[in-house]
Amino acid sequence: MEVQKEAQRIMTLSVWKMYHSRMQRGGLRLHRSLQLSLVMRSARELYLSAKVEALEPEVSLPAALPSDPRLHPPREAESTAETATPDGEHPFPEPMDTQEAPTAEETSACCAPRPAKVSRKRRSSSLSDGGDAGLVPSKKARLEEKEEEEGASSEVADRLQPPPAQAEGAFPNLARVLQRRFSGLLNCSPAAPPTAPPACEAKPACRPADSMLNVLVRAVVAF
């Protein structure tokens, strides 16, 4: 009955709107969209109201039923605890006089001082007698490794460096040899001029022999 009444109400409302919007431009199209939204809204309201009415009797039934004993477990637990304990006993801790005294071993173990933690602070070398005595073992080991690496690198560099004889090439340094010869000739004292032979023993004039200096100059130019 309620659905029929709602349908009749929507029909009369839509007819009244169509009659009044017949002279408006685009009134019918607007009325159709408004009519659709009105129908959907009313259908939603009817559906929700019917659903609420169906759920109300289901909610009222559990309230009328007797209470379930499983819903109150704390009370049962308290009753069982009271029955388990005798009437004259109370669950209170024993006094200090009746408790057992701890043994000597336990007291010594509790009172024993804890081992001192190893200090991780580095000691300064100024407080120690020797230079390496104040260093931490790890630092000393690192320094030794660094020195060994430097020694190995120097040995490799010495091996890779060519000897001086190989650096000059296959032939000896000619300039060095000539320099020694020239310095020897220049540093020596000039020889005494030869005495002229007598006229009777005069021989025909000939070309004088070349000096050692001229020979060396020619050799340098030819080379």
From Swiss-Prot:
Record's keyword terms, sorted: Acetylation, Cytoplasm, DNA-binding, Nucleus
Compositionally biased spans, kind Basic and acidic residues: 69-78
Function comment: DNA-binding protein that seems to act as a transcription factor. Involved in the regulation of neuronal differentiation, acts upon JNK-signaling pathway activation and plays a role in neurite outgrowth in hippocampal cells. May mediate with FIBP FGF-signaling in the establishment of laterality in the embryo. Promotes cell motility, seems to stimulate tumor metastasis.
GO biological process per UniProt: cell motility; neuron differentiation; positive regulation of transcription by RNA polymerase II; response to fibroblast growth factor
A molecular function (GO) term: DNA binding
Designated name of the protein: Immediate early response gene 2 protein
Family: Belongs to the IER family.
Low complexity composition bias: residue spans: 125-138
Reported tissue expression: Expressed in activated T-cells (at protein level). Expression increases in metastatic tumor cells (at protein level).
Gene source species: Homo sapiens (Human)
Top-level taxon of origin: Eukaryota
Tagged with keyword Cytoplasm: yes
Main location: cytoplasm
Annotated stretches, region: Disordered: 63-172
InterPro entries for this protein: IER
Keyword check for Acetylation: yes
GN (gene name): IER2
Compartments reported by the entry: Cytoplasm; Nucleus
